[in-house]
């Protein structure tokens, strides 16, 4: 670079060429400066390519974690979708060829398309054939022996949700079942609580019978039951019963408390009680009012007993017209002036 210098004394202009010195100064290599002992110490900055490699490796690890999570999520989703198909395959292991209607139902249950369901079953059958290469084997035996022949990281026969490599079939413990027990339904909670499968089948009925609560036994229901049992016994031993009831009427009447005790007590006999039975048919045409008046205990109120006999006669006439149908009247005498009349229609046995 040229420099113009003005000389005040002579007024001459001098031209100096400073380019050479600058060129010499600028031409010095920087390596000498860097190599000099006075240069600043090096800062611990790694070179460019290793830094890029570290960043790329770190990015690769982060992406691998994200991709691994996506893969696991996708695998779990596929397992959930294929679970209904696995269950169907295990139930129909003897003939794993679903019809079109069954494929449509499975597609709706597994959120797959009809083509995906068909492909899934085709792949499952092909996998069973390729894994268990023994000829002349049924599908049930192939499914049973699949886990024994599978190798490596191939799919196992499992429908459990925590199995990460399941594609088709059923749980391995179930494949070890005997062939005779294939068609038996499996109820895990019931089998665990019971000792055998038979008990598991009987348990719901017994539990239902235990949970059933009988209605309260009022006096009316007890009285009807007691009358029915007594009537059968009276019809079987008519002659003996009539004699005993006559003796009972002559001996006197029970009080109301004794009657209730006799009614509630299960050990009480049909002959012991303040009951008067009279069994007859419509074809003999006997006067019911007279027989009831003869068999009742001694009473001074004739009008009262006439009303009772008339009510009994009207009740007997109002009941069916069948000749084989008879009635049995029961007079419950609680005291000398209070009585109840029970008329029960029962089929009478023809006497030969």
From Swiss-Prot:
InterPro entries referenced in this protein's UniProt entry, alphabetically: HD, Homeobox_CS, Homeodomain-like_sf, KN_HD
Key words, A-Z: Developmental protein, DNA-binding, Homeobox, Nucleus
GO cellular component: chromatin; nucleus
SMART domains according to UniProt: HOX
Family listed: Belongs to the TALE/IRO homeobox family.
DNA-binding residues (ranges): 71-132
Function according to Swiss-Prot or TrEMBL: May act as a morphogenetic regulator of cell adhesion.
PANTHER family, per database record: HOMEOBOX PROTEIN MOHAWK (PTHR11211:SF3), IROQUOIS-CLASS HOMEODOMAIN PROTEIN IRX (PTHR11211)
GO molecular function, one term: DNA-binding transcription factor activity, RNA polymerase II-specific
Pfam families: Homeobox_KN
UniProt protein name: Homeobox protein Mohawk
Compartment(s): Nucleus
GO BP annotations listed: cell development; muscle organ development; regulation of transcription by RNA polymerase II
PROSITE patterns: HOMEOBOX_1, HOMEOBOX_2
Region of interest called Disordered, as start-end residue ranges on this chain: 19-54, 159-189, 245-301
């Amino acid at each position: 670079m040229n420099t113009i210098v003005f000389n005040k004394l002579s007024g001459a202009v001098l031209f100096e060429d400073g380019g050479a010195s600058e060129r010499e100064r600028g031409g010095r290599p920087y390596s000498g400066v860097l190599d000099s002992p006075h240069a600043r110490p090096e800062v611990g900055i790694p070179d460019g390519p290793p830094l890029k490699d570290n960043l790329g490796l770190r990015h690769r690890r982060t992406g691998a974690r994200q991709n691994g999570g996506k893969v696991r999520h996708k695998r779990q989703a596929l397992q959930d979708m294929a679970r209904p198909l696995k269950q169907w395959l295990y139930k129909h292991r003897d003939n794993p060829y679903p019809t079109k209607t069954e494929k449509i139902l499975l597609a709706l249950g597994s959120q797959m398309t009809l083509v995906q369901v068909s492909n899934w079953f085709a792949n499952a059958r092909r996998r069973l054939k390729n894994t268990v290469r023994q000829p002349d084997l049924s599908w049930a035996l192939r499914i049973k022996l699949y886990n024994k022949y599978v190798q490596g990281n191939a799919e196992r026969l499992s429908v459990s949700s925590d199995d990460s490599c399941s594609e088709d079939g059923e749980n391995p413990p179930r494949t070890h079942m005997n062939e005779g027990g294939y068609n038996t339904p499996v109820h895990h909670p019931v089998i665990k609580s019971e000792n055998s499968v038979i008990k598991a089948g009987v348990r719901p009925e017994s539990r239902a019978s235990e949970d059933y609560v009988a209605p309260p036994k009022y006096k009316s229901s007890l009285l009807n039951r007691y009358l029915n049992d007594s009537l059968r016994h009276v019809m079987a031993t008519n002659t003996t019963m009539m004699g005993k009831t006559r003796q009972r009427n002559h001996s006197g009447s029970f009080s109301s408390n004794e009657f209730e005790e006799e009614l509630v007590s299960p050990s009480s006999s049909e002959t012991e009680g303040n009951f008067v039975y009279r069994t007859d048919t419509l074809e003999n045409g006997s006067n019911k009012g007279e027989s009831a008046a003869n068999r009742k205990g001694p009473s001074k109120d004739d009008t009262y007993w006439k009303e009772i006999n008339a009510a009994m006669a009207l009740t007997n006439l109002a009941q069916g017209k069948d000749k084989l149908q008879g009635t049995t009247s029961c007079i419950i005498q609680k005291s000398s002036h209070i009585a109840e009349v029970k008329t029960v229609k029962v089929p009478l046995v023809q006497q030969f």
